Amino acid sequence: CLITNCPRG
């Protein structure tokens, strides 16, 4: 996932 699109790190 992207750094700004990670619901759980």
Swiss-Prot record:
Family matches, as InterPro entries: Neurohypophysial_hormone_CS (IPR022423)
Residue numbers bearing the Glycine amide modification: G9
Domain of life: Eukaryota
Entry keywords, A to Z: Amidation, Disulfide bond, Hormone, Neuropeptide, Secreted
One Gene Ontology CC term in the entry: extracellular region
Compartments reported by the entry: Secreted
GO biological process: neuropeptide signaling pathway
Disulfide pairings: C1-C6, C1-C6
UniProt entry tagged with the keyword Acetylation: no
Signal sequence bounds: none
Molecular function via GO: neurohypophyseal hormone activity
Membership in a protein family: Belongs to the vasopressin/oxytocin family.
Functional description taken from the UniProt entry: Diuretic hormone.
Assembly notes: Monomer (F1) and homodimer (F2); disulfide-linked.
Official protein name in the record: Locupressin
Organism field: Locusta migratoria (Migratory locust)
